[in-house]
A protein has these predicted regions:
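Residue-level signal for threonine
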Residues: 43-44, 135
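Polar, glycine-rich mid-to-C-terminal structural blocks
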Residues: 1-41
């Protein structure tokens, strides 16, 4: 989704808030060059631990630094994953200036090629009638996504990065994790886990680990299908 302006100057109706709401928190308005952000999205230990250390997507999706009040980058040394912000939409790379405190021109992904590859792999994994050739192709598409994530050539097999072909069930579980790694913070995960019938169980697992301060003022008013088990 393309946003052309930032609500400053001529193009005032084509702006978004990508990075302003879901960037690395920085609220010192005296440093506009950094880019104001309320930092409303943080990581979870589950998400962080899905990545291997040499997966380049981890420290891009989950910021490994924060900003001081003066706009200096400060590395995060704590093992507390709850304090790490979404890093995928960083305002420091925003080209349109002056930067606004309310809107940005940062685009938001609607459909990426890696998503298409993973959709193919999932469709093959979910189909009991999938043929051997389709399964091989599905693993290849999955591994292309992984190779890119590790900074490797997408068309060249890489030992230690590529997943071996181990059947449909293993493929589906691998796709579930890979969609999180590749498409994190892109507003797809909820629909994914609803589609897999895992929404309720996953929310319950998060509920017992999330810091109490995050949930003390909220309570459930409705469930999202499929219906939760008793």
């Amino acid at each position: 989704m393309e946003f052309y302006g930032n609500n400053v100057g001529t193009y005032t109706t084509t702006a978004g808030q990508v990075g302003r709401n879901n960037g690395i928190k920085f609220t010192n308005t005296d440093k506009p060059e950094i880019g104001y952000s309320i930092g409303s999205i943080r990581a979870t230990p589950y998400f962080f631990q899905l990545f291997e250390d040499d997966d380049e997507r981890r420290d891009w999706s989950i910021a490994d630094y924060e900003f001081t009040d003066e706009g200096e980058k400060k590395a995060i040394s704590s093992n507390n994953m709850w304090i790490r912000f979404c890093g995928k939409f960083r305002r420091e790379y925003e080209l349109l200036t002056p930067k606004s405190t309310t809107n940005t021109s940062t685009n938001f992904p609607i459909l990426r090629y890696s998503d298409v590859l993973l959709m193919y792999a999932e469709a093959v994994a979910a189909d009991e009638t999938s043929e051997a050739g389709e399964l091989t192709q599905a693993y290849e598409y999955l591994n292309r996504v992984r190779r890119r994530g590790y900074g490797r050539d997408v068309n060249t097999p890489v030992m230690g990065v590529d997943l071996p072909e181990e059947g449909r069930i293993s493929l589906l579980e691998a796709v579930k994790d890979e969609r999180a790694r590749e498409l994190g913070h892109e507003l797809l995960r909820k629909d994914d886990i609803i589609r897999w019938g895992e929404f309720y169980d996953r929310m319950q697992s998060v509920r017992v680990t999330v810091p109490e301060a995050y949930t003390s003022n909220y309570y459930c008013l409705l469930y999202t299908s499929p219906s939760p088990r008793d």
